[in-house]
Amino acid sequence: IHLSGEVGEMNREAIKVFREMGIGRIIFHRKNTVVLMRQMIEAVNAEKLEFEAFALNELCQFTGAFCNSLHCDEMGYLCRTTYWGDAEMEERMERVIKRTLEIEEQQEQQYLCGKSGCALCALPQLEAAGITHLKLVGRGNYVEDMIRDIWNLKAALGILEGDQREEKETGRYIDQLNKKIFDGQPCGNNCIYNPGQFL
């Protein structure tokens, strides 16, 4: 039995209870830090448990069960819906909406790995924390983008597997990620886990 990250609050005692209930895998919620995940895993001495963390897509912690608009086909995300009041504001909003739609149209044509949430740079830390499985979110994504996400995650895992421990710590892993996944361009800076928390 796999326990969804949508269960919300997770702590050492909760993991112990779920282990006693026969849960085989704990999926950590996006809001947990790598440090917290490590502490929980170490505290329960969980030899028979598997642990899963988010690796790509959907940075927002409310995207799953806690989003009131995601599963409604008739409307988009409420947090991305524009609102306006008076006539002057309406004119400004129309210009903003037009520009936003133009930018979104351009962005839809440009694939960027992890543009809605990424933890590829945190893979060595997730591994060291005891994470045994990774979650790649696919809901709401284009099939072509999902295929590229899968290839990129596999490539990142290949880089990680090929690196020696010392090289990961000196940043060689990040350099290779930038070259192989991001083609030398900067990443989207949409880190699921705070980039400074595990340094």
What are these regions (language model features)?
Residues 1-9, 13, 21, 27-199:
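Active-site pocket-lining/capping segments in soluble small-molecule metabolic enzymes
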